[in-house]
Amino acid sequence: MSTKKWILTIIAAILLPVLIFAIVCLTRINMKVGDYEYSPELPKPGIGVDFGYDDLFGDLYVRWCNLLDNTQTALWKAPAGITKQSVSIPARDGFSIPCYVIVPAGHEDEKLPTMLYCHGGAFFLTMMTCQLDAASVYAEELQCRVVLPQYRISFDAPYPTPLYDCYDTLKAIAADPKTDADHVLIYGDSAGGCLAASVTQLCCDEGLLAPAAQMLIYPVTDNKDTYPDLTKFEHAAWPHKGNTRMWKRYLNGQDVTGSDYAVPMLHETLSDLPKTYVEVAEVDILCDQGAAYAEKMLQAGVDVTLQSVPGAYHGYDGDVHNTFVRRMLDTRIAWLGSVLP
């Protein structure tokens, strides 16, 4: 075979799988995401590939997204007045948990209130730059340190590993002399909200420390498939099919009960939980279950603030410069500020 034919064969061997992958992804785009009534102050959620396909192509798409997100977060530059640090925290099984630490510039070595930020992403997606953006806003406005663990994703290590990575990060925060131990905040969005809720339960049950507060943003709280919003908004920004796959990968066939920490709604003892803020997006399959967890905590005697955001969708707060988003960030900051010195 001539050199030219060899080159063409190699190019075809490379491009053909890429082309097949692209075509399959195009057939899986959620075209119905724009069918709902969103706030006119927010950009409509963009169409994207449905994460609900649990097969080879679905896995490849997730890996591709994670590769891009990991690259972007590594290259992310902190805004003026903020320092971004990279640290590693030992996990209980010997793994080193990579973490980003976002802190007000000039205060890196001071004792500060500290937030554990459990990022969202269906337990199988890695951290995104929008979460670093939000962490920077909190660090600046609250003059606190924000620690974001890059916990192992469920594709590689299902429950309980992602939870324990976050909890072991909280243990390191508690042991750090630069932490104001009386003002530790636990925060999470989406699946990170599930992790944050479970970390808070575990922390209170084991007596690690007394968190000043927990903040759960459009959180995953239950694996039941009976909430009306799961059908009402099944094709919205976070689709029902993706939610089903999320739980399948996270639990990995494990039978969960109220005695463990996989599903916040199943946990039986909630009365010792700290002051809590739960935010739900109105146009979101997770709206009902977030409100249900808030109600369960209220019934247990927990001081709970439930904030419903009209016209908002799952992940609506990705652009911290949007006026609608900034208004909600200010609401969160005001609430968090009420529990800090």
Describe the role of every protein-language-model region.
Residues 73-87:
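A domain-start/cap signature at the N-terminus of enzymes
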Residues 8-9, 67, 336:
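General helical structural elements
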Residues 1-19:
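N-terminal Sec-pathway targeting helices
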Residues 57-58, 68-72:
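Beta-strand-enriched cores of mature, soluble protein domains
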Residues 22-36, 42, 48-64, 83-341:
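Alpha/beta-hydrolase superfamily serine-hydrolase fold, recognizing
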